[in-house]
């Protein structure tokens, strides 16, 4: 017997009963200035400069899942994956999205410490020699307090999103595309196979890459009140 039958309500009412709304609220006192700085780089980038969105996608798991099908009573076959899986390790993907072209620079790492972040930034700067680089980042601790590296790279300027507002970073959109188009529902027999799979996707994506177009007219700091309904 379903819960809707037990409670005497409709399926829609039962779903609403267990509905949980969630969000991440930014309490950054400098939200407006930081958001304007980031959005300004999207809609009016400095002349002859490169704007990059940089972040990492940590702990991408190489999971090996059994593939197969289940024959249903009506004769149809239901294909899918087993709930069980075998772990083959994880990789952290560092990525830089070039705002003007939509193209991706990506590399794999075992960890995501400051040293790995700066190693990636060294490879990014080498890709654009003698160019002014504006790099959009979130507020991860490894992204902050890199004054010595910035002094050694005077052509690079970091721009930080407001706290709890990493959605302003366009590379987060690309990570979502990567997950939906390339990683969801996959199975890998080794960490190397996962990394090669991601690399092949990045290459194919860059062949057809187009820049994201910023269309939101206003970015405002929102204040929410929590609501949770659990009563039957």
Give a label for each model feature:
Residues 112-113, 135-146, 163-168, 193:
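Acidic, metal-coordinating catalytic cores used for nucleic-acid/nucleotide bond scission
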Residues 35-118, 219-231:
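Extended, low-complexity cationic-aromatic segments
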Residues 115-134:
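Short, basic/hydrophobic alpha-helical segments
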Residues 1-27, 50, 56-62:
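Conserved short alpha-helical interface segments
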Residues 80-85, 152-170, 186-188:
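RNase H-like polynucleotidyl transferase catalytic core
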Residues 193-232:
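C-terminal domain-tail junction helix/linker
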Residues 104, 171-190, 206:
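Active-site proximal helix-loop segment of RNase H-like, two-metal nucleases, encompassing DDE(D)
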Residues 7, 53-55, 96, 102, ...:
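Mobile genetic element proteins and their domesticated derivatives, centered on retroelements
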């Amino acid at each position: 017997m379903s819960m809707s039958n037990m409670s005497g309500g409709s399926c829609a009412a039962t779903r609403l009963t267990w509905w949980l709304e969630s969000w991440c609220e930014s309490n950054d006192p400098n939200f407006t200035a930081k958001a304007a700085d980031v959005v300004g780089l999207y809609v009016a980038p400095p002349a002859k400069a490169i704007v990059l969105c940089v972040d990492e996608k940590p702990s991408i798991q190489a999971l090996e899942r059994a593939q197969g099908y289940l024959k249903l009573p009506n004769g149809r076959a239901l294909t899918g994956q087993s709930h069980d899986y075998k772990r083959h390790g994880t990789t952290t993907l560092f990525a830089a999205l070039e705002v003007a072209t939509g193209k991706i620079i990506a590399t794999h790492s075992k960890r995501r410490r400051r040293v790995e972040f700066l190693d990636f930034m060294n490879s990014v700067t080498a890709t654009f020699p003698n160019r002014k680089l504006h790099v959009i980042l979130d507020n991860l601790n490894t992204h902050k307090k890199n004054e010595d590296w910035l002094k050694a790279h005077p052509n690079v300027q970091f721009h930080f999103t407001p706290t709890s507002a990493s959605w302003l970073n366009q590379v987060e959109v690309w990570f979502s595309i990567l997950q939906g188009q390339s990683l969801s529902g996959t199975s890998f027999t080794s960490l190397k196979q996962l990394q090669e799979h991601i690399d092949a996707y990045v290459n194919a994506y860059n062949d057809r890459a187009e820049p994201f177009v910023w269309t939101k007219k206003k970015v405002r700091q929102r204040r929410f009140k929590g609501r949770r309904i659990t009563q039957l």
